[in-house]
From Swiss-Prot:
Co-factor remark: Binds 1 [4Fe-4S] cluster. The cluster has a structural role.
One term of GO molecular function: oxidized purine DNA binding
Chain residues that bind DNA: W33, R34, Q51, T52, L89, G90, Y91, Y129, T313
Protein name as annotated: Adenine DNA glycosylase
Gene expressing this chain: mutY
Residue positions of the active site: E46 (proton donor/acceptor)
Co-factor(s): [4Fe-4S] cluster
Native source organism of the sequence: Bacillus subtilis (strain 168)
InterPro entries assigned: A/G_AdeGlyc_MutY, DNA_glycosylase, Endonuclease3_FeS-loop_motif, HhH-GPD_domain, HhH_base_excis_C, MIG/MutY, MutY_C, NUDIX_hydrolase-like_dom_sf
Reported function: Base excision repair (BER) glycosylase that initiates repair of A:oxoG to C:G by removing the inappropriately paired adenine base from the DNA backbone, generating an abasic site product. 8-oxoguanine (oxoG) is a genotoxic DNA lesion resulting from oxidation of guanine; this residue is misread by replicative DNA polymerases, that insert adenine instead of cytosine opposite the oxidized damaged base. Shows a powerful dicrimination of A versus C, since it does not cleave cytosine in oxoG:C pairs.
Binding site for [4Fe-4S] cluster: C201, C208, C211, C217
Domain (HhH) ranges: 108-137
Length: 369
């Protein structure tokens, strides 16, 4: 008998299920993707909820499913419009993978999200968690859906001290959930675990006295709930120093640039920018040389207007922001010139939305009497 089997034998699993599910059915939050448990909408919500808080997701979800209400609508949509609808949520590979996957659903499965574990799990961007969450919630399949919330809850329930930052640890929790999950109500069970982790069994200050499964919790019994789960610390993100410029011409049109189709923030739009180096030249001087060499642009460039910081999981951008008026341009093939009204139609990463906001505030100040 392995350690997990020994821990499972000590639990009244049926009573745990009953206590968790009855609490969830009584206390669950009203969330828009729970209204009809449509497989497509559940799928969209689960993709949005990766790395993003529920409160942030709700308005994005409502706008997204209004604009793309069905598999077919999203499959047939122009990528620019999809990226614009996702603008601000970040982690844009999520929505690119989602659109690729729904195209396959439309083509291979007649627009119906496949209920089969192998079929759905084979779609682009569908990992073990998304597969378990969507199929259990929408199709009532008894499949584990193990994310950080669930690992935290179950590490405390079963007193599991394995490092949850290590990929191999996930299999321990998947095995545990297979033993625990209700075959009659897998949707309510998985959602109950997620809800418990979000509302009660929180990372730093769990509300153990309010917990519906407190009597089943080994960590509560041992007084170790604040020590679990074990999670090794990530490396500090690297720092990239950059300079960006909001360039306008004499008509007030703005120059923007599209990022490459692969890599970080692929296919999003941004203002001309470069990675700067410490040395003899100032950031402003480096920017002047970059505009000349890359685009053949000569411009009157302001002094430093401010700095925008944006934090990714693995990287921090520190962007020095400048404004400029184009005097001469010899090659605009790498840039797009748009009006300020047209600019609102393009999807920009959050960092460059902040830059544009900074430009708008500066213009408002200079225009003030």
């Amino acid at each position: 008998m392995n350690v997990l089997e020994d821990k499972l034998k000590q639990k009244d699993i049926q009573q745990f299920r009953d206590d968790l599910i009855s609490w969830f059915e009584r206390e669950q939050r009203v969330l828009p993707w729970r209204e009809d448990q449509d497989p497509y909408k559940v799928w969209v919500s689960e993709v949005m909820l990766q790395q993003t808080r529920v409160e942030t997701v709700i308005p994005y979800f409502l706008r997204f499913v209004e604009q793309f209400p069905t598999v077919e609508a999203l499959a047939d949509a122009d990528e620019e419009k999809v990226l614009k609808a996702w603008e601000g949520l970040g982690y844009y590979s999520r929505v690119r993978n989602l659109q690729s996957a729904v195209k396959e659903v439309k083509q291979e499965y007649g627009g119906i999200v496949p209920p089969d574990e192998k079929d759905f799990g084979g779609l682009k961007g569908v990992g073990p968690y998304t597969k378990g969450a969507v199929l259990s919630i929408a199709y009532n399949k008894p499949i584990p859906a193990v994310d950080g919330n669930v690992m935290r809850v179950m590490s405390r329930i079963l007193s599991i001290w394995d490092d949850i930052a290590k990929p191999k640890t996930r299999t321990i929790f998947e095995d545990a959930i297979r033993a625990f999950i209700s075959k009659e109500k897998p949707s309510e069970f998985n959602q109950g675990l997620m809800e418990l982790g979000a509302l009660i069994c929180t990372p730093k200050s769990p509300s153990c006295l309010l917990c519906p499964v407190q009597q089943h919790c080994s960590a509560f019994e041992e007084g170790t709930e604040r020590e679990l789960p074990v999670k090794s610390k990530k490396k500090k993100p690297g720092i990239k120093t950059m300079a960006a410029i909001v360039l306008t011409d004499e008509d007030g049109q703005v120059y923007i640039h599209k990022r490459p189709s692969k890599g970080l923030l692929a296919n999003l739009w941004e203002f001309p920018n470069l990675e700067t180096q410490k040395g003899i030249k100032t950031e402003r001087e480096q920017l002047i040389a970059f505009l000349e060499n890359e685009y053949g642009i000569q411009a009157d460039i302001s002094d430093l207007q401010g700095v925008v910081e944006h934090v990714f999981t693995h990287l921090v951008w520190n962007i020095s922001v400048f404004f400029g008026k184009v005097k001469q341009v010899s090659d605009t093939s790498k840039l797009k010139k748009v009006t300020k009204e047209e600019l609102e139609q393009f999807a920009f990463p959050v960092s460059h939305q902040k830059i544009w906001k900074m430009a708008g505030e500066a213009a408002a100040i200079s225009a003030a009497p």
